[in-house]
Regions:
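Carbohydrate-active catalytic/glycan-binding domains of CAZyme proteins
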Residues: 1-130
Length: 131
């Protein structure tokens, strides 16, 4: 079972996605475009940037809702799939958190984190299983 989200190390910078000043400028501009888009959902969990689809773990724990979902945090394309993570006290106001799971070179999930689920384990921690 994967480690609880708050115990995960920061996401590594992938060799194919260097954090160059140009990349940061494009990501910042992209956030402004999304913020001002009249068609962007206002009452729907949405990451600040990147691709989102397939909620794979929605649970209530500790007085909050926790949502895990397929997410490409670096581009708006269906690739480089991570598990994004958001939480909410009321299913209307969402807090975005660091990715809960990310692909790692040399492992079975190197091609992406796809389907799975989240559960509250016997020790009270949030656990995730994925394929």
């Amino acid at each position: 079972m994967a480690a609880p989200a708050d115990r995960l190390p920061p996401a590594p910078v992938d060799r194919d996605w260097p954090m160059t000043p140009g990349y940061v400028a494009r990501a910042t501009a992209g956030r402004a475009i999304l913020r001002d888009d009249p068609h962007r959902p206002r009452y729907h969990a949405c990451p600040p940037v990147g691709w989102m689809n397939d909620p794979n773990g929605v649970i209530q724990h500790g007085g909050r809702w926790h949502l895990f979902y397929q997410h490409n945090p670096r581009a708006s394309v269906h690739a480089d799939m991570h598990w994004g993570y958001m939480s909410s006290p009321d299913l209307v106001h969402w807090d975005d958190h660091a990715c809960a799971l990310r692909p790692e070179d040399g492992t079975y999930d190197a091609q992406g984190i796809w389907s799975g689920n989240a559960v509250v384990a016997d020790d009270g921690e949030i656990g995730r299983a994925h394929v």
